Amino acid sequence: MKLATETSPVKFDASVEIHIRLGVDPRQADQNIRSTVALPHGTGKDVRVAVFAPESEHAAAKKAGADIIGDEEFLSQLDKEELNFDILVATPQYMPKLGKYARLLGPRGLMPNPKSGTVATDVAKAVSEAKAGKVEYRVDKQAIVHLSIGKVSFGAEKLSENARAFLTSLNSQKPSSLKGVYVKSVAITTTMGPGIKVENSL
């Protein structure tokens, strides 16, 4: 981790990312890994959270730190394809209204999902967790999971703690049907920096 922070070639505070190759087959439903983890030190990014919920939830959402809060008027923003947020939280009863925007939100990873905690009856809690550093991760078609675990300025210790929290979460998602090796390789990179292979133990 220290090596990653020291080899960053850029002048700005680069992001540090972890890339884990898994021994899963993402085409199998029970091996399509998708979950969330609360990083103890956050990601270092200012996350903009939008809330689509009944007006009765708006005050609590605002108090929790939501940046954009809307009822029906929020849909007009989506009609214009204005996506000025990083995470979208919605209540279960409002999810059907987002169905027609699946093609807009889905490919960008913005569609609320119960697995990621963004379809929630407790909107304020979902907003607080998102702001505090709760992030979603999922395996891609190549069976690799990518996650930003902070900034170079965090230092090796905090980055390692974030990485360990992620690995613990990832290990808890190991499919019971998997017979072979679960975590095949781990690499750490910074923005524009080299990929550094690390031992699974970090």
Question: What are these regions, as identified by a protein language model?
Answer:
Residues 181-202:
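N-terminal charge/polar-biased segments
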Residues 12-16, 173-185:
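Flexible, glycine/charged-enriched surface loops at secondary-structure junctions
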Residues 20-22, 53, 91-92, 149-151, ...:
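Flexible glycine-/small-residue-rich
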Residues 1, 61, 106, 188:
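Residue-level signature of catalytic and energy-coupling elements of molecular machines
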Residues 60-67:
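Glycine-rich phosphate-binding loops that contact phosphosugars or nucleotide phosphates
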Residues 2-59:
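Translation machinery proteins
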Residues 67-171:
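Long, charge-patterned amphipathic alpha-helical coiled-coil/hairpin "stalk" segments used as oligomerization
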